[in-house]
């Protein structure tokens, strides 16, 4: 497993170096390149509510952010340029998780749903109701076949692809 992880890392390693994004309750995010010093390389703005979660795609090309403003934003993972807005949740979005192949992501929300999004088409693929309360956590299985979600309803659900 460790060998596979190292191979994947070497395959996608960016010649520009690793990047870090910090999200904040002042509605902004900053992109940094730690090896280049302490000055941020991009300021990412546009959310109208507190930013709850940010996640780079496994291939490093994209970044998504989830917010209390009920939206998900897609950004260029190298430059920080805004690319697309995803709307569909009716309450705050708490967390997002990428599929291993970077083609899809899933979002978890206060509205008790999960939503599966297609990156290429940039639209909602599936709405996954099933929890009785806010969904706080979501993640993909390493093989991409399942999604796990945890909710305030005290249920852990496993969704099959």
Predicted ranges, named:
Residues 5-6, 44-51, 86-93, 128-135:
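WD40/WD-repeat beta-propeller blade N-cap
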Residues 16-18, 59-61, 101-103, 143-145:
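Short coil/turn segments that connect the beta-strands within blades of beta-propeller domains
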Residues 23-26, 65-69, 107-111, 149-153:
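Conserved strand-to-loop turn within each blade of WD40 beta-propeller repeats
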Residues 29-33, 72-75, 114-117, 138, ...:
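WD40-repeat beta-propellers
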Residues 39-42, 81-84, 123-126:
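A structural motif specific to WD40 beta-propellers
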């Amino acid at each position: 497993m460790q060998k596979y992880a190292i191979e994947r890392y070497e395959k996608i390693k960016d010649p520009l170096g690793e990047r870090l994004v910090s999200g904040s309750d002042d509605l902004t995010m900053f992109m940094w390149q730690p090896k280049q010093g302490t000055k941020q390389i991009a300021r990412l703005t546009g959310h109208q509510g507190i930013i709850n979660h940010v996640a780079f795609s496994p291939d490093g090309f994209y970044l998504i952010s989830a917010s209390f403003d009920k939206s998900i934003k897609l950004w260029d993972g190298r430059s920080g340029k805004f690319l697309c807005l995803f709307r569909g949740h009716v309450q705050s979005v708490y967390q997002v998780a990428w599929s291993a192949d970077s083609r899809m992501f899933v979002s978890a929300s206060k509205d008790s749903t999960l939503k599966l999004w297609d990156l290429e088409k940039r639209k909602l693929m599936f709405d996954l109701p099933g929890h009785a309360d806010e969904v706080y956590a979501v993640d993909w299985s390493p093989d991409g076949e399942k999604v796990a979600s945890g909710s305030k309803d005290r249920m852990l659900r496993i969704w099959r692809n």
